[in-house]
Regions:
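Extracellular beta-strand/beta-solenoid scaffold signature
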Residues: 7-30, 41-50, 59-85, 97-113, ...
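All-beta strand scaffolds that present successive hydrophobic residues in beta-strands
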Residues: 1, 10, 30-37, 55-60, ...
Length: 141
């Protein structure tokens, strides 16, 4: 997927977006996605999953588009973003920016928030403000 002629803004420009359209009462019934072997170039945000169960994100290359707006509030971007998910696997992915830039402090390689037992291993990040961040995890095992 190539987005060299950017479409959208930092808030709505995603290469792949996987979500559960209806909030379920049992997280085990949330959708499962297998996102693998994708080449993503020029998007502000690469892959996002929300309200999923046992999704797998593996062997992807995400080359993010920099947003050098240095104003508050900052424009947060993620190569891979996982939110409110259960038992996901994120492995063997490459997330990067084209070059180093001090204005890219709000760009995250892999970001997970509000998730239960995420498994994040063997990934590579380069030229992003934060490589891997885990926030508000709910590990019940």
């Amino acid at each position: 997927m190539d987005n060299t002629s950017v479409q959208g803004t930092y808030a709505d420009n995603f290469a792949i977006r996987c979500t559960e359209p209806v909030l379920t009462t049992n997280p085990a019934t949330n959708a499962k996605y297998y996102i693998y072997n994708n080449y993503i170039n020029g998007y502000y945000n690469g892959i996002t999953t929300k309200l999923t169960f046992q999704s797998t994100i593996t062997d992807n290359e995400v080359h993010m588009r920099p947003d050098n707006t240095n104003v508050w509030p900052a424009h947060f971007h993620s190569g891979i973003f996982i939110e409110a998910t259960n038992d996901n696997l994120v492995t063997k992915n490459l997330v990067d920016m084209p070059s180093s830039n001090p204005l890219q402090w709000w760009h995250y390689g892999i970001f997970t928030a509000g998730s239960t037992t995420p498994k994040i291993k063997c990934n590579s990040t380069n030229y992003v403000g934060v490589g891997i961040i885990a926030n508000g995890l709910n590990n019940t095992t």
